[in-house]
Amino acid sequence: MADLENGRGSGAGEKDPKLSDENTDAAPATPTSRPRGLLARLRLFETHMDRKLGIESDAIERKRAEDRQHVPWHEQLSMALLWASGTMNTSCFATGFLGREFGLDLRQTLLITILVSLLGGAVVGAAATFGAATGLRQMSVSRFSFGWWPNKVVAVLNAIQQLGWAAVSCITGGLALTAVSDGRVSLAVGIVILAVVAWLISVVGLNAILVYERYAWVIFFVIFMIMFGETGRYADNTTPATATGANLAGGVLSLIAVVYGSSASWATVASDYYVHYHADVSRVKVFLLTTLGIAIPTSIGMVAGCVVSSALNVRPDWETAYQKGLGYVIQESLYPRGFAKFLLTLLVLSGINTNVIGIYSAALSFQQISRPFSLVPRFLWMLLSLAGILALALGGREQLNQYLQSFLSLLGYWCTSYIVIILEEHYIFRKGDFASYDLDGWNTPSRLPHGIGASVAFGLGVVAWCMGMSQTWFVGPLARLIGDSGGDVANEFTFVVTAVAYPPARYLERKHFGK
């Protein structure tokens, strides 16, 4: 830890203009590569706004240990509350309906939802421990295993992931807004409103996000407790699963993939929200608060969806409302009607919480795709992120269930490979010691691994995804063996393949190149 506080972790070399000669794409924003013209004026404006509002004009720079302060214990609760606000939302509620779609009964769906949410939360908790210890954002952390060039692919995937997940939240929130207005506000308009409000909050920066998310969860926790109280009596725990045999196994595996993808997908942004904590903050505390901050709120939202979806078997009026849209079934299941509209109006805001995180982290990922991209002000990347979210949400707004099944599963696939590589690098090759990281060289290609081992393991992981995935548009050869519609085993197979492939590939890379 001493290295983090002083020597190698000091960050003194981060703005050193002396770069390796292999590094044309990568010149930092130093005197050798300053933005010019309009870009320079925009960066100047961003710096001015940073001084006034703290919008983080240097968001992707490493936060050095001496620049960070100890955070009071009550503010450290944000490690959990941030995620509580981002996950207790209508998207998780909608995901709770998928167990019924896969032919599972209520008991099976609840068990999978709770246990797999905990597993996914643990994955995020493990990733989060790198933030305070290194002072680096998640996409910068992964440079120490993926290397400079392969990590660009990871940054692109992460940006797409954040935009896609935010689009899901816009769709579910827009559906709720449409129901509240009795159809007077179209789904498209609702999507635009949610995306723009989230963008405005995200622009201000991490400090505003942490304050907003620290308290926003309370509203949605109360709403879901009311929902449990009013709908729990209709939960149908007697109707058996409609799927049997191999089809039941396939449904179980597919639901596991969706729930895991929903929870674990935050692993690729986790460190983004911990860089302001002091380097000596307890990593056990970080892990536990993050894990529970993901698992419990995710379970609350999804379990509420499980309960209401099971009640469709005994409440045909709810089934009719569900066919009209997600917001209508929420409104129909709560009473009195005026109170239901009020709660639904508040629940619309839950989509903003997820979007705030998605837009903020997507902009950070875009800035790390290449050095020229890093010179573009963060607020412009956030504007482009807003446009991407609107395009995805408006394009997929009529196919929510298919969007959820396909997109959330895909999130889990690549996040599994990512976290396995990050953790094996840390615990096998660096012996769990953050002092072994050349943190000053985080932005210098010649001081980073080449990423050959990670590329090989990640590439084999992609093959494993394709063999084990079960999507509406493609069913892999392994998945096809399980049930009529296939059973998604992509995460499990990807985990095994990546975990086995990375150590020997990385060993050979280190032996040949010495880093």
What are these regions (language model features)?
Residues 2-106, 250-256, 276-285:
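Membrane-interface "cap" regions at the ends of multi-pass membrane proteins
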Residues 419-501:
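C-terminal membrane-solvent junction of multi-pass transporters and transport-like membrane proteins
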Residues 188-193, 352, 356, 368-401, ...:
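Loop-to-transmembrane helix boundary motifs in multi-pass membrane proteins
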